[in-house]
Structures are given as C-alpha cells and as structure tokens.
UniProtKB/Swiss-Prot annotation:
Family, as annotated: Belongs to the Fe(2+)-trafficking protein family.
Function text: Could be a mediator in iron transactions between iron acquisition and iron-requiring processes, such as synthesis and/or repair of Fe-S clusters in biosynthetic enzymes.
Protein name according to UniProt: Probable Fe(2+)-trafficking protein
Gene Ontology molecular function terms on file: iron ion binding
Amino acid sequence: MSRTVNCIKLGREAEGLDFPPLPGELGKRVYESVSKEAWQGWLRYQTMLINENRLSLADARARQYLASQLDAYFFGQGADAPAGYTPPQN
C-alpha cells in the first residue's frame, strides 16, 4: 500500500515518495510534503536549469544553487526561470 501526502505543490492528496530524495532536513521536508507527481515535475525543471545554465554537478556551488531552487520551487515563491526562457503556449 502506498502512502499519501497532502502535496504542497499540487494542493491535493496524492501518492507520496517512497523514500526521502535527499539527505538532511530538506530531504525530510520534501518526503513529508511532496507527491511523486510533483517530484517528477521538479526533476524536469531541474534538468532544464542544469542545461540552460550549463551547470556542472561536480561544482559544489551548482549543487548548492539547485538545493536553493528546490526549496524555492516547493516551499517558496517559485524557482528561477532560466534567462530567455519562454514557457510553451498551450
């Protein structure tokens, strides 16, 4: 049986993550309040940030930047949009 969480991003009950995706307090907060669906959205957004900003995950500053963006994406006012990014028109 899967666990459910009141997803902070989706604003509704949804299937929760199977385990904390990160170590530490931030990983615990994500595990307790983010659904699998919202986490997949973050992974897509994180990939865009890495590619558009040409981040190297070997760089500690890049990892710190992504952690701050993750916090903003779920618990703040939203993550940064890459420079020049225009969301697709539906």
